[in-house]
From Swiss-Prot:
<keyword id="KW-0648">Protein biosynthesis</keyword>
<feature type="binding site">
    <location>
        <begin position="121"/>
        <end position="124"/>
    </location>
    <ligand>
        <name>(6S)-5,6,7,8-tetrahydrofolate</name>
    </ligand>
</feature>
<dbReference type="Pfam" id="PF00551">
    <property type="entry name" value="Formyl_trans_N"/>
</dbReference>
<dbReference type="InterPro" id="IPR005794">
    <property type="entry name" value="Fmt"/>
</dbReference>
<dbReference type="InterPro" id="IPR011034">
    <property type="entry name" value="Formyl_transferase-like_C_sf"/>
</dbReference>
<dbReference type="InterPro" id="IPR037022">
    <property type="entry name" value="Formyl_trans_C_sf"/>
</dbReference>
<comment type="function">
    <text>Attaches a formyl group to the free amino group of methionyl-tRNA(fMet). The formyl group appears to play a dual role in the initiator identity of N-formylmethionyl-tRNA by promoting its recognition by IF2 and preventing the misappropriation of this tRNA by the elongation apparatus.</text>
</comment>
<protein>
    <recommendedName>
        <fullName>Methionyl-tRNA formyltransferase</fullName>
        <ecNumber>2.1.2.9</ecNumber>
    </recommendedName>
</protein>
<keyword id="KW-0808">Transferase</keyword>
<dbReference type="InterPro" id="IPR005793">
    <property type="entry name" value="Formyl_trans_C"/>
</dbReference>
<dbReference type="GO" id="GO:0005829">
    <property type="term" value="C:cytosol"/>
</dbReference>
<dbReference type="InterPro" id="IPR041711">
    <property type="entry name" value="Met-tRNA-FMT_N"/>
</dbReference>
<dbReference type="InterPro" id="IPR002376">
    <property type="entry name" value="Formyl_transf_N"/>
</dbReference>
<dbReference type="InterPro" id="IPR001555">
    <property type="entry name" value="GART_AS"/>
</dbReference>
<dbReference type="InterPro" id="IPR044135">
    <property type="entry name" value="Met-tRNA-FMT_C"/>
</dbReference>
<dbReference type="GO" id="GO:0004479">
    <property type="term" value="F:methionyl-tRNA formyltransferase activity"/>
</dbReference>
<comment type="similarity">
    <text>Belongs to the Fmt family.</text>
</comment>
């Protein structure tokens, strides 16, 4: 089916690429795609295009990569050029998903139907940069995707629609991300169909209660503090997969922990100091925590690959009584 509603799309990572692909496949014309500039990545630190740019180029879409859209920012000339491009590109609405650049009011005012954001949480919970990670880390039972009419605030716009998704006990940020991306893609296509048909999308202001912020994940958060309860650490490991991973330091070596589950305290676990390995078995490495213990089932040594505990121990033996370092507490 071919649609007439013209969509400028702004986004950067895989989460956004899923939405762009759905919009394109649904038959909406996309006269322009905005995405972040290419960035160095990988071991060779070569410049790499974003997932959104890769999709757009593959399908013959025009792409712009301004470093900023703020005239008062660090790149005023580039911002001015990008804003002029938006003004001169005929379109009806802008869809924004994990773009990574601030959109000033001047930009929000350009599309006739405004700017619609696809956000990976049930707003107003987890506004900000890392909503998927923080929902898992906090132990939330569910999360979701919210479509909102953008304003200049940080994810504060009026809500158009949401989809709720349960968080499974074994979900990682990677697995949950993929379900949320698919849900967001479905939501935005349905919303664009309604916008084209009705000319408007009703939206409800976000409630004042229940606001939380999902701050960007920093590498410094990766270190596991074994003084915390085992269930908290298990959630941290799941939340930090694929980035930055949970890190445990043993004899100066940083070992990444990729899969773990809490186990009840009994016997030697109950009396062992936090960070102490109480068992190193093929089924997993059991480490004492502030309360309970963590059975780690997937590990990675520096320069190595993720391995199941059985394979990891075959090449890098661990033994009961060894102790992971405790990170400094700010």
């Amino acid at each position: 089916m071919t649609h007439t509603l013209r969509v400028i799309f702004a986004g950067t990572p895989e989460f956004a690429a899923a939405a762009l692909a759905a919009i394109h496949k649904a038959g909406f014309p996309v006269p322009l795609v905005l995405t972040q500039p290419d960035r160095p990545a990988g071991r060779g630190m070569k410049l790499q295009a974003s997932a959104v740019k890769r999709y757009a180029v593959e399908h013959g879409m025009a792409v712009a990569q301004p470093p900023s859209l703020r005239r008062a920012g660090k790149y005023p000339a580039e911002a001015a050029d990008a804003i002029e491009l938006l003004r001169t590109t005929p379109h009806d609405v802008m869809v924004v998903a994990a773009y990574g650049l601030l959109l000033p009011q001047e930009v929000l005012d350009i599309p006739r139907a405004g700017c619609i954001n696809i956000h990976a949480s049930l707003l107003p919970r987890w506004r900000g940069a890392a909503p998927i990670h923080r929902a898992i880390e906090a132990g939330d039972a569910e999360t979701g995707v919210t479509l909102m009419q953008m304003d200049v605030g940080l994810d504060t716009g009026a809500m158009i629609e949401e989809a709720r998704i349960a968080i499974a006990p074994d979900d990682t940020t990677a697995t949950l991300h993929d379900r949320l991306a698919a849900a967001g893609a479905r939501l935005i296509v349905d919303a664009l169909v309604r916008l084209e048909r009705d000319g408007t999308l009703p939206a409800t202001p976000q409630p004042a209660d229940g606001v939380t912020y999902a701050e960007k994940i920093g590498k410094h958060e990766a270190a596991l503090d074994w003084r915390k309860p085992a269930d908290v650490l298990a959630r941290q490991v799941r939340a930090f997969d694929p980035f930055p991973g949970g890190v445990a330091t043993l004899d100066g070596a940083a070992i990444k922990l990729w899969a773990a589950e809490p186990v009840a305290a009994h016997g030697t676990i109950a009396t062992a100091a936090p960070g102490t390995i109480v068992e190193a078995a093929p089924e997993g490495v059991v480490v004492a925590c502030g309360s309970g213990a963590l059975r780690v089932t997937q590990l990675q040594k520096p320069g190595g690959k993720r391995l199941p505990a059985r394979e990891f121990l075959a090449g890098s033996p661990l033994a009961a009584g060894q102790r992971f370092a405790l990170p400094d507490v700010d």
